[in-house]
Amino acid sequence: MSNDFEIQSYPLTVRTNRERVTAFLAANGLRLDALDYYAVVTAVGDDQILAGGGLDKNIIKCIAVSDTFMDEGISATLVSHLMSIAMSRQYEAVKVFTKPSNQKIFESLGFHLLAEAPKAVLLENGLSGWLTYERYLKSLRREGTSGLIVMNANPFTRGHHFLIAQAARQVDTLFIIPVKEDCSKFSYAERKAMLEVGCRDLENVIVCEGSDYSISAATFPTYFLKELDEAATTQMTLDLNLCAKRIAPALGAKIRFVGSEPLDQMTKRYNELMHEILPLEGISVVEMERLSERDRAISASAVRTALAEEKFSEAAAKVYPTTIPYLLAKLASMALQKELDSSPKPGLVDQIDAGAHQDMDYSLMCRSIHALHPHFVALAQLGYQEKLPTSEEMRRLGLEAEREMLLATNNVNTHKGALFAMGLVLIAAAHNYYIYGVIQEQPLRTAICRLASDFPAPKGTHGDAVRRQYNVGGALAQAAAGYPDLFDNWLPYLRQLKGDTFAAHKTLLYIMTKLDDTNVLHRKGAQVASKVKEEARALLSNFSEAELIKLNQQYIKENISPGGSADMLSLTFLLNAILS
């Protein structure tokens, strides 16, 4: 490319840039896909787009060159630029999703073909990538007849286990490849772990590592958008081509199993194409009826809907038993996020401001929740057994969670109080479900009491000093009593506000009227703590958002943060969902 032209980053977050790129791609028979980087080639001193291309992580997409300026030198320079950006992100392999007419250009730059469809090709360049994954798959091969299932398991349901068990009976070895793309409600790590623990009773099942080569942003991006169109059909064809010519042969799999799909049109079309494409490469397709209840297939989407609506019992009825701890952990993280998102709040971090905190903000709190989530799973799994765990077992997991939280927040104590309370409830709830197959209030309260009573009172902490100075119970005493205020007052109060836009805010204020908040006592003393209760009571009796905003501004000036009340609000949200 001559010095008369230049490559420049072209942020698509700028509306005018996005509109120009969309129009440029449309003129070249393409549409704008989801991208996190885009670059354009222009003449020096001119802003007319002559060529452009983008990245979605390590996948080059939306490559186009103006018909009036078909210069392969520009194409090569543009692709080299995009490759360097991808490599700077620590990716060792770069993929490109493009039109077949561009295949030779990319092959001249060291790319090799992975899969093809009539209207698109997928190529790759790099030292690792498919060859590394192929070696891994070949290492898993077993003697005898092998089959394959590609599964999202978002989350792992009784229906998933039913399909796997049915397929496993028909082969000597059954390989499960979980979808790796992390744009599901449950992360890839969680979904893979759910599959592994859920299939332990099936000796001939091997859960493989997922990859970018099965239902991913590279092979099938519209799967995650659920947009059934011509582009989706092209992507399905590419994905199935990869399976037939590369993945299945690497595993030695001769059968691909799939569940029937009566509802989702995207998956239904994918199954139809599977029957057309895979047999051409000697791979049989076995489509099995899904497990149904009341004439409706058990689906992961129904579980996700129930979780979004905070209906644990409805979600739990559909999942495989080993998935229960993951549901409880998800509800715990959702409860923390719901408390954080409730805005405005008096003196507390929310989406608007940091309240009375100088060392915290919204993004830091989000990082803290994200860091705690895997440990919520571990705590729930600890409780999911016949016997309640010991205080030492709980303490060990709690300290691990606290270390991860502090690492994520640069040693800022964002959720230590919430971690203790939620950890106890998660363990108790998981234990109750394991024993009774349901979570009911009284057995849950009893289990919380037993767990908390085993904990020694902490010494040398701010909470310990506050308890001694002001003769208040604190977090451990509340838990050892089974959270009577929460179960008897705060939870019923939240539930009677169902449908109220300000239910969370009013419940927070109601908690503030009752709780001896050790955060407030530590910061400001007993007199201010009493004043906080009175102010919450007054605002609650004559509530308005404007007055809530004023109270927040006042608490920011006075350095008042009712953090203990925020923890109890999160716990109230969690118990409301668990006991739904």
What are the roles of these predicted feature ranges?
Residues 70, 79-87, 168, 303:
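A conserved short alpha-helix in the GNAT/GCN5 acetyltransferase fold that borders
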Residues 69, 73-81, 159, 163:
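Conserved acetyl-CoA pyrophosphate-binding loop and the N-cap/start of the following alpha-helix
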Residues 42, 47-64:
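Conserved beta-strand in the GNAT
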Residues 325-391, 395, 429-553, 559, ...:
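Phosphate-rich cofactor/ligand-interacting catalytic cores and adjacent structured alpha/beta frameworks
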Residues 1-32:
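Short amphipathic alpha-helix that is part of the acyltransferase structural core
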Residues 98, 102-327:
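Nucleotidyltransferase catalytic core that binds NTPs
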Residues 409-426, 559-573:
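Conserved phosphate/anionic-ligand binding catalytic regions in large, soluble enzymes, centered on
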Residues 86-99:
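Conserved GNAT acetyl-CoA-binding A-motif
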